[in-house]
């Protein structure tokens, strides 16, 4: 689309009639910060004249961006709701200040001037126009100011203190647990080493044998 607009912009202009006003516009304006100033320079002095100066968008000038009516001292402005536009009028120059432009508003723009009083009615011959190329804005992270970094460092310090306190509590609980475990083991060993009272012993009886009668052997 941009190439087509460039081709339209550089077509040779048609020969201007005697009752037409010439207008000079920049061939192309590149917008990087969503705002641009478009100056329309005319070969006609607007001082003490009743006029209407307007800016149109599109190759067929289908959309009126903004316009100013009246005279040099008391201009009345009207603006399309889709644009943020203000107008400044000079003796031979009308400047349109466009702000908050979007990428989809890239197009060719035409200046138009109509002299309403005194007669006769005169307007400008259509110029080659100005291509306004709106680039997409990429926001870069701004460096942090010292004031904005204070809450961040305060949060870091608080978190550090909490982590250190948690570590101390964990170490203390671990030491207590180890000491309790060691004490239980020592008590268990002491109980195992306590002398026990011997139980009743079994008596071993010799098997009974009848007593021998030695007197019988003697006789």
Swiss-Prot record:
Any Pfam family the entry gives: V-set_2
Phosphoserine: modified positions: 188
Leader sequence residues: 1-18
Ig-like V-type domain span: 28-136
InterPro entries found in the cross-reference section: CD28, CTLA4/CD28, Ig-like_dom_sf, Ig-like_fold, Ig_V-set
SUPFAM superfamilies attached to this UniProt entry: Immunoglobulin
Keywords: Cell membrane, Disulfide bond, Glycoprotein, Immunoglobulin domain, Membrane, Phosphoprotein, Receptor, Signal, Transmembrane, Transmembrane helix
Subcellular location, record wording: Cell membrane
Transmembrane segment boundaries: 152-178
Keyword tRNA-binding: no
Membrane topology: Single-pass type I membrane protein
Residues with Phosphotyrosine modification: 190, 208
Any one cellular-component term (Gene Ontology): external side of plasma membrane
Function according to Swiss-Prot or TrEMBL: Receptor that plays a role in T-cell activation, proliferation, survival and the maintenance of immune homeostasis. Functions not only as an amplifier of TCR signals but delivers unique signals that control intracellular biochemical events that alter the gene expression program of T-cells. Stimulation upon engagement of its cognate ligands CD80 or CD86 increases proliferation and expression of various cytokines in particular IL2 production in both CD4(+) and CD8(+) T-cell subsets.
Subunit and partners: Homodimer; disulfide-linked. Interacts with DUSP14. Binds to CD80/B7-1 and CD86/B7-2/B70. Interacts with GRB2. Interacts with PIK3R1. Interacts with PRKCQ.
Name of the protein: T-cell-specific surface glycoprotein CD28
Gene name for this UniProt entry: CD28
């Amino acid at each position: 689309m941009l190439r087509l607009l460039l081709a339209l912009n550089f077509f040779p202009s048609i020969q201007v009639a005697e009752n037409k006003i010439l207008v000079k516009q920049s061939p192309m304006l590149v917008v990087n910060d969503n705002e641009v100033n478009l100056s329309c320079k005319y070969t006609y002095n607007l001082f003490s004249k009743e006029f209407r100066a307007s800016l149109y968008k599109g190759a067929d000038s289908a959309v009126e961006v903004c316009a100013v009516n009246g005279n040099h001292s008391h201009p009345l402005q009207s603006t399309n709701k889709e644009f943020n536009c203000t107008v400044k009028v000079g003796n031979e120059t009308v400047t349109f200040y466009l702000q908050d432009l979007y990428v989809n508003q890239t197009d060719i723009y035409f200046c138009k001037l109509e002299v309403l009083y005194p007669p006769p009615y005169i307007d400008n011959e259509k110029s080659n126009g100005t291509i306004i190329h709106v680039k997409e804005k990429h926001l870069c992270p701004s460096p942090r100011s010292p004031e904005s970094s204070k809450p961040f460092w305060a949060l870091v310090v608080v978190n550090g203190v909490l982590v250190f306190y948690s570590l101390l509590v964990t170490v203390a609980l671990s030491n207590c647990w180890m000491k309790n475990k060691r004490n239980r083991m020592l008590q268990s060993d002491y109980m195992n080493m306590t002398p026990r009272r011997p139980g009743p012993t079994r008596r071993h009886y010799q098997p009974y044998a009848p007593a021998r009668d030695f007197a019988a052997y003697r006789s």
